[in-house]
Structures are given as C-alpha cells and as structure tokens.
Design a protein with these regions (language model features):
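Helix-to-loop junction immediately C-terminal to a conserved catalytic motif
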Residues: 39
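Conserved ABC ATPase "signature" region
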Residues: 88, 103-121, 146
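Conserved ABC transporter NBD signature motif
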Residues: 47-55, 64
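Conserved ABC ATPase signature
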Residues: 100, 125-129, 133
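The feature captures the beta-strand-to-loop junction immediately N-terminal to the Walker
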Residues: 24-26
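Catalytic Walker B motif of ABC-type/P-loop ATPase nucleotide-binding domains
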Residues: 150-154
Length: 195
C-alpha cells in the first residue's frame, strides 16, 4: 500500500500434489499478500508463478477457477443459504450461466460434504454454524470446485486450539486422500508443527 517493500528475493520453490504445505510467519509479514499473488488476485511485482507447468498470467479467469480454489480468512456473513447450496457454488466454473447443478455436480457436492465429514450439516443454514463448522463448509466448497490446488489463508484463525488441531489433521488427510496440493498460511508455529 504505497511504498514497495521487498521482503524476499530469488525464491524458487515447488509443491507437489498430495502435499500439505504451510507458509509460516508472523502477522503482517506478507503471507496473505503472497497468497493473493499466487492466486492472481493481485499482480506480482516480478518473477514467475507456474501452476501445472503454465505461467499463472497465461490462464483466463475461467481457466484459473478450474485450477485454484481459495479459502480466505474473512468470515462471510451469508444469510438465506443452506450449507449444500453454498458448497454447490463451488461448481460455478462448470455450470452454465444460471448455475444450475447437474446430477454429476450434485454428486461432486455430496462427495465433498462426505470428505470433510459434515453430512449432518448439509441442510442447515450457513448463518447458524459455528466458526469451525463454517470453515469446514468453505473447505468442502473448495473441494467441490475440483481444482488441483487449494490455497487457505489462516484457515484456523477463529478456532479454539482443539478445533485448530482437528482442522490441520483434516487438511493433511484431504491432501493425501484427494492428491491435491494444499497450501496454507499461518502465524501459529505450534499448530504448524502439528502437521
């Protein structure tokens, strides 16, 4: 915001499918900025970002929505929508203009709900969920998007410690079970060491 401050230079890194990778750093050091850059939400200052062998800038927005899904830190105040409807929005890169879910889309949504372990929440209204339940719903939405890469910005920010550990274990399990690349940021060293 204003002056450009270089916090790192000459970084070369790769993350494989089926891996959960944690970006660890104190609050305010640029973790969220890096995630926004990696997901093309904001322009990069320099260098190259490749996903599946293709420069991120060479993807159209629609193509990128089939490659990267993002779960942000901000709590969404969603009213008048059920859990299954919200998770169904993860299918938007594959649906037509009206967003009508096909039988296959509904199957993907149901599978995502099962993977995250929230079938009992499927017909609840989103605004009635606890923070931990809501975060699981957002992860299920990212899974329903069927991208090879999932970015999560401080996914445990509003959770108590036992829920944080449960969330990290879930993400670790999902990375292996789905063979997705899961990349998350956190400032919590103790939590990062749990994985």
């Amino acid at each position: 915001k204003g002056d450009v401050k270089v916090v790192a230079d000459g970084i070369c890194a790769g993350i494989n499918s089926g891996e959960l990778t944690c970006l660890l750093g104190a609050n305010g050091v640029g973790k969220s900025t890096l995630l926004r850059t990696l997901s093309a939400f904001q322009p990069k200052l320099g260098g190259n970002i490749f996903i599946e062998g293709k420069e991120i800038g060479d993807y159209t927005d629609k193509q990128l929505s089939r490659v990267i899904s993002v779960v942000l830190t901000e709590k969404c105040d969603i009213r008048n929508m059920s859990v299954v409807e919200l998770i169904g929005l993860g299918r938007s890169p594959y649906t037509g203009f009206w967003g009508t879910l096909s039988k296959e889309d509904k199957t993907v949504v149901d599978k995502s709900i099962a993977l995250v372990g929230i079938p009992h929440l499927a017909h609840r209204m989103v605004h009635t969920l606890s923070d931990g339940e809501r975060q699981k719903v957002m992860i299920a939405k990212a899974l329903a998007q069927e991208t090879p890469v999932i970015y999560l910005d401080e996914p445990t920010a509003f959770l108590d410690f036992p829920s944080k550990v449960e969330m990290m274990q879930l993400l670790h399990q999902l990375s292996r079970q789905t063979d997705k690349t899961i990349f998350l940021s956190t400032h919590d060293l103790e939590l990062a060491l749990q994985i």
